[in-house]
Structure formats: structure tokens, C-alpha cells
């Protein structure tokens, strides 16, 4: 009787652990889908902002037309210079399974390792690059405000894009310091986009691995 009772309890505990395991993996999978959507939005805007700077620095005959196709207003041009975009993917579900200790139910060491790499290592790299860009952006904004206040004041929705572009382009072409600050920000944006691509590759690889585990468990 004791032996049967013990085996029954062991079976129930194993079943409960398996349910917790599937629940944890499903939660991670849901959040990875959310992060994927977030990264696509970030990538589109990161690339757009960098292209605005590219065309301003190029100063080619088609530069304004190219920028005009990218942004809807003068502030859209100014944003690429005077602001930055954060990188804050949704991580509540991951943080919960860490804080609650339910990460222990995930058997696969490779899944746990890739989760840590994505949410700690690669995330830290991206945050560091965004912080660096923020410092450059602050220097750039301050330099513009101190040396080209009229350009700053033109950065509003009722200013024609062409008017704002012409004023900004004139400033850039006649000021090596301004151009150097813009180029530094442009270069940092390129590094950010490179690491975002790597982050997305790791995310997709991890999501595919989790999907296979769930399929093998008959949970999907």
C-alpha cells in the first residue's frame, strides 16, 4: 500500500512538473512572438532614421526626394538627428519565470542557455549601443541649439519639409563639426542595426527550438 501510494504521488508530481514545463515554454514562445513583432517595428524605424542621416550627409541631387519619401513632416527629419529610439523588448514573462523559479522546469540546457544569451548578453549589447547613441545625440542636439537655433525652431509640423531640409542641409554642408557629429551618430546606428539583426537571428533560432520541443511533447 505504501509503495503504491508513493508511486501514485510520484506520478502526480511528474505530471504536474510536465504541465509546468509546457506552461513555461508556451509563455516564452508567446513572448518571443511579441519580441519578434517589436523588433520588426524597431528595425523599420532604425533603418529609416539612419537613411535620413545618410541622405543629409550625401547631399546629392536626389537627397531631399529620398528623405521626402521616408518621413511625413519636418519633425520626422529632425528626429533622426535630435532624438533616439530606445530598445525595450517585452520581457515580463521571461522575468517572471526567472523570479518565480519556474525556469527549473525547462529540461533543455540549450534552451536555457539561448534564453540567457538573448535576454542578457545580446540585450546588454544593444542597450549599450543605444546608450552610446543617446550620448552622441545629446551632443548633436546641443550643438545645433547653440549654433543653429533657427534650424531648431523650424523643426515643427507647420514647417514645409523642403524649407526645413534646406536650412538643415545648408548648416551641415558648411560645418565640419556638425557633419562629424552626424556621421558619428550614423555610424553608431549602423552598429545598432547589425546587433539587432544578430538578436533577431538568435530569437528565431530559439523560437524554432522551443516549437520543436512543444511538438515533441504533443503540446502544439
Residues covered by each model-derived region:
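Hydrophobic membrane-insertion alpha-helices, especially the h-region
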Residues: 1-6
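Long, hydrophobic alpha-helical segments that serve as membrane-spanning/inserting helices
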Residues: 7-220
